[in-house]
Structures are given as C-alpha cells and as structure tokens.
C-alpha cells in the first residue's frame, strides 16, 4: 500500500510516527508555547529528533513544553527554545541571524505559529496583524535561513481550509481601503502561506529542498480565543457545504494530536516528491488551487512589502 494511503483524518502524531527513528534530525518548529506547536514538538522529540522550538514568550514556552522535554529525554531527543516574535521584523532578523551564526543545518522547518480572526491591529512594523504574523513573519524568517536547509530538507507551512475565505490582496494588505473583516484577513494570510510553500518549492527543489502547505483540521486550541464559538460553527458549516458540493467529506472536530498529525506526516513520513509544492490535509495530498502567475505574483509582492518595510 502506498504510504499516502495509510493514514487519514483520525490519525494521531504518534500513530503517524510509529516506528520512526528521528535521531540525528534537527527540526525547527515555530509557536511551541501552545496547542499544535507543543504537540508537534513533543511527537518529534519523542521519536528522537532535536527540536528547536521558537516562541515569543519564552517563559510561557518553558512551562508549556515540560512534557516535551520529558518525552524527549526518554527517546534520545532534545528541545531547545529560541526567542521569536513573528510580528516584529527586528526580532525575526535577530533570531535568523543567531541561527545562521550557529551554522547548524535543519532537516525540517515547520512554520506552525499563527493567530486567527484577531481584532484589527498592526504588527510592530505596521502590517495588518494576521497577514504580518501568519505569513510575512515566516516569509522573512524562512528566506533568511534558507541556506540552513540542505539537500533532503523540507519546509512545512501551516495553512488552513480558511484559505477559502479570501485570495491575497497585496494592493490593500493593511485594509486601508477595505472594511476589516477578521476571517477575510485570516483567509488572506492562509492563502499566502500556501502560495509561499509552492513558490519556495519551485525555487529550491533543484537543490533537493521541498516545501508543502498543510491544513491541520478544525481543532479547539488557543488559536480561536478571539472568536465566538457560534461564529466558528457557521464558518465550518459553510466550508462543509462547499466540500459536500465537491463530493468531499465534511469537517469533523479533531483532537490536538490528530490536528498535528498532518504536519509530522509531511515533515518525515510522506515521500518528498509526493508532497513537494502541494497542499495537504488529513495526511493526504490535496488539490492544486493556484496557477503559476498567482504564485509568482504573490511571492514577488511580499518581497516588495519587506523591502518597503526596511526603508521606513
């Protein structure tokens, strides 16, 4: 049976990684102070990986990852924490430069951290909070440390089925001419995450580095703290209706270990050639949703935003 057919929506991280020995693998996971980030780091370290966990609040992350360190110790893995504020370009560059100075390669980068449906606001550099945190922050970090990804390495970007809420709008990224709608902003950022993975894969696959985007599923975590549960259910129903029209199964709530399963599946189980440049969900490869012009345009547009930020 093909490896992509073995797991599914109800698979957990430990089921996906069962029998895998990740000793000698070095993996960067962002957002390890809550939810999916903690479980992603735990499952990888529990199978022997050396995990570098990035978090904005190191004190919170230290307390939140106690179980990660216990599981790592029993399997020969390790967890190290580094400071990273995705909503602050200065912090991003300092973190990247520290990692570059060490000169240690990564086998996998999992861009896990993010926010959802936040009230209107801006990052330290003036970008709309969700686009700046979920996409732009990772865009800057990953492109800066790309030399630390060698042949055989992978980049895994966390996206969401929420990408259906909106395409990317680089003409008005900060909602200066458009009324702010939290889930539209979230959708923009998650669509950008997918397009970034596709563009990164095209740019780096020639040197043996692949990239994919993953949708974890619908999970009760801190991510939804800004949203009325009734509002979330309306949106889930909307997406489920669209999926039903496409002949797909409607969404079901997942546990955190089930939600993190697709990330670790894409990071170390699925064949790189099968997931490279693809969108994945439920431990399977999903459908291609963007054309080449869109991918290139967004990638170039985000790069211009970064350049503009450095000039101010």
Where does each model-flagged region fall?
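Conserved C-terminal active-site "lid" loop/helix of NAD(P)H-dependent oxidoreductases
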Residues: 278-312
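Rossmann-fold NAD(P)H-dependent dehydrogenase/reductase core
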Residues: 2-232
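SDR active-site lid
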Residues: 202-292
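Generic low-polarity alpha-helical segments
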Residues: 2, 92, 131, 241, ...
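Generic hydrophobic secondary-structure packing signal
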Residues: 37, 57-60, 189, 255-262, ...
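Short, amphipathic alpha-helical "lid/cap" segments that border enzyme active or binding sites
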Residues: 93-96, 256-267, 299-310
């Amino acid at each position: 049976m093909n490896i992509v057919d073995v797991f599914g929506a109800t698979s957990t991280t430990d089921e996906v990684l069962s029998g895998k020995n990740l000793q000698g693998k070095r993996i960067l996971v962002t957002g390890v102070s809550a939810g999916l980030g903690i479980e992603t780091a735990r499952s990888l370290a529990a199978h022997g990986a050396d995990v570098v966990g990035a978090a904005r609040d190191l004190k919170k992350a230290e307390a939140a990852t106690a179980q990660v360190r216990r599981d790592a110790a029993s399997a020969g893995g390790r967890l190290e924490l580094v400071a990273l504020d995705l909503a602050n370009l200065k912090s991003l560059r300092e973190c990247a430069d520290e990692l570059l100075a060490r000169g240690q390669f990564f086998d996998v980068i999992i861009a896990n951290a993010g926010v959802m449906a936040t009230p209107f606001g801006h990052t330290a550099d003036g970008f709309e909070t969700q686009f700046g945190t979920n996409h732009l922050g990772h865009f800057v970090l990953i492109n800066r440390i790309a030399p630390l990804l060698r042949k055989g390495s992978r980049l895994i970007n966390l996206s969401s089925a929420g990408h259906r809420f909106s395409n990317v709008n680089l003409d008005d990224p900060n909602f200066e001419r458009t009324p702010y709608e939290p889930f539209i902003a979230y959708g923009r950022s998650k669509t950008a995450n997918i397009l970034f993975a596709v563009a990164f894969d095209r740019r780096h696959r020639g040197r043996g580095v692949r990239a994919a985007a993953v949708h974890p599923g619908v999970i009760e975590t801190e991510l939804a703290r800004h949203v009325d549960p009734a509002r979330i259910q309306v949106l889930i129903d909307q997406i489920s209706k669209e999926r039903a029209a496409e002949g797909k199964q409607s969404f079901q709530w997942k546990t955190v270990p089930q939600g993190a399963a697709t990330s670790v599946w894409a990071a170390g189980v699925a064949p790189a050639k099968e997931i490279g440049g693809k969108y994945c969900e439920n431990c399977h490869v999903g459908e291609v949703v963007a054309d080449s012009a869109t991918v290139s345009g967004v990638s170039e547009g985000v790069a211009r935003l970064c350049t503009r930020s450095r000039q101010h």
